[in-house]
A protein has these predicted regions:
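ABC ATPase NBD coupling module
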Residues: 71-88, 106, 114, 236-241
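Conserved ABC transporter NBD signature motif
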Residues: 59-70
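A short, proline-enriched helix->beta-strand linker immediately N-terminal to the Walker B motif
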Residues: 165-169
């Protein structure tokens, strides 16, 4: 069976400096893959590569196949067709994606307007349904509210509603639970899990929260200096890590150092 997402020998360079080195992995429909590693390991560069949003000067090489289509060959208009429809995105800081001058309901509706043939009334109904799903209506948030009138957690819920609006095949979630309180984090992850089961949505989740990763991810990929040092089923990675870097990373979490910067981990040289 062909995987939903196939990444083969993906390398990214910036001004001749390598950031990702021949990275390869697959992701099945309905599964969650967590990418972990210290800051600067290449996690966000991977996410931006998958979304076609690399900054100018960053050169990707290799293959990123989604539904067997090589995304690295797409033009920008073609990328615009799949972002928000086949490919959903949620970022760590919602205000980097939300327009501060437009109402929340209108921004959620934009995704439906761009990628569906729903009527105006159907779009409004679906917008309200999405706001209900992510818990905004229950929290008393109106579709006419502006982003600055929402709490950080509510903004993240609004961004998730936009990302899930068209039932994407793949959701890229880059540190999207970092700023959330425990209750909101649990609610958001429950909603994501619901979509993996009911819509077979795959999720690539970038996180420093190893407890969250262990509880929710099906597979884990460990990045160090742009290189995958280890990947496999979550239970295998957490219970029997093979690489010294992975062992140190998990040991820190186990010993109550979850909030210690990963940059303080022992240094291991990874051959290029």
């Amino acid at each position: 069976m062909t995987s939903l997402l196939q990444v083969r020998d993906l390398s990214v360079h910036s001004l001749a400096r390598p950031i990702l080195h021949t990275l390869s992995f697959t992701l099945e429909a309905g599964k969650i893959l967590a990418v972990i590693g210290e800051s600067g390991s290449g996690k966000s560069t991977l996410a931006l590569s998958l979304m076609g949003l690399l900054p100018a000067g960053f050169q990707p090489h290799g293959e990123i196949r989604l539904n067997d289509e090589n995304l690295l060959t797409l033009t920008e208009p073609q990328w615009c067709q799949i972002r928000g429809k086949t490919l959903g995105m949620v970022f760590q800081e919602p205000m980097s994606a939300l327009n501060p001058t437009r109402r929340i309901g209108a921004q959620i509706a934009d995704t439906l307007r761009l990628h569906t043939t729903l009527t105006r009334s159907e779009i409004r109904d679906q917008t309200l349904a999405l706001m209900e799903q992510v818990g905004l209506l229950k929290a008393g948030v109106s579709e006419r509210a502006y982003p600055h009138q929402l709490s950080g957690g509510q903004r993240q819920r609004a961004l998730l509603a936009m990302a899930l609006a068209c039932k994407p095949a793949l959701l890229i979630a880059d540190e999207f639970t970092t700023a959330l309180d425990a209750r909101t984090r649990a609610d958001v992850m429950a909603l994501v899990h619901s979509h993996t089961k009911t819509h077979r949505m795959a999720v690539l989740m970038i996180s420093h929260d190893l407890g969250l990763v262990r509880h929710h991810a099906d597979h884990v990929l460990v990045l160090k200096d742009g290189i995958c040092v280890e990947q496999g089923p979550t239970a295998s990675i957490f219970d029997a890590p093979a690489h010294p870097y992975t062992q140190a990373l998990l040991a820190m979490s186990l010993h109550g150092a979850a909030h210690t910067p990963l940059s303080r981990l022992p240094v291991y040289t990874v051959p290029v």
